[in-house]
Design a protein with these regions (language model features):
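A generic local structural motif
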Residues: 38-40, 90-93
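A short, structured active-site edge motif that brings together acidic residues
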Residues: 73-88, 94
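Short beta->alpha junction loops/turns
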Residues: 56, 82, 108-109
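A structure-centric signal for secondary-structure junctions around beta-strands
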Residues: 1-2, 100
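Active-site micro-motifs of SAM-dependent methyltransferase domains
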Residues: 12, 83, 112
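Active-site-proximal alpha-helix that buttresses catalytic centers in soluble enzyme cores
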Residues: 3, 7-79
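Active-site-adjacent alpha-helix immediately C-terminal to a catalytic or transition-state-stabilizing loop
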Residues: 60, 93-115
Length: 115
């Protein structure tokens, strides 16, 4: 059975309103939340074969906090996932190799929520 884990990036910071959206980091609360989610995944989630992650800083920082939970999964950081709609995310998932049983997708709302 194929499995998909949909993850929105953890809480981002709005401390510097001059930063481009793509470069917004996680807030301290977001770092803590991502670490808690990693603990949860280690205990409860199936082994992940592939992680697809948006190239935005906050999604990459979320991934960094969760990397251990994904074990030896292949990791792909992709520009096309930043700002992707649900249809675009679905199209990207259709291109995943058949050998991947469990895929984690770290992205943004509204795309993740709508998917």
């Amino acid at each position: 059975m194929k499995r998909l884990l949909l993850l929105r990036h953890a809480k981002s910071s709005w401390d510097d309103p001059g930063l481009p959206d793509h470069e917004r980091p996680l807030a301290p609360r977001g770092h803590r939340a991502a670490e808690r989610m990693a603990e949860y995944l280690r205990s409860n989630a199936p082994a992940v074969d592939l992680v697809l992650c948006s190239s935005a800083l906050r999604t990459r920082e979320t991934l960094e906090r969760m990397t251990d939970a994904f074990g030896g999964a292949e990791i792909a950081v992709e520009d096309e996932l930043y700002g992707a709609t649900d249809d675009e995310l679905l199209e990207r998932l259709r291109r995943v190799a058949m050998g991947s049983e469990t895929v984690a997708l770290i992205g943004h709302n509204p795309g993740i929520q709508d998917l």
